[in-house]
């Protein structure tokens, strides 16, 4: 996800 790029 853009806000949580560690999660994708």
UniProtKB/Swiss-Prot annotation:
PTM annotation (Glycine amide): residues: 8
One Gene Ontology term from the biological process aspect of the record: neuropeptide signaling pathway
Pfam families per record: Kinin (PF08260)
Gene Ontology CC, one term: extracellular region
Function: This cephalomyotropic peptide stimulates contractile activity of cockroach protodeum (hindgut).
InterPro entries: Kinin_peptide
Localization (cell): Secreted
Name of this protein: Leucokinin-7
Keywords recorded for this protein, A-Z: Amidation, Neuropeptide, Secreted
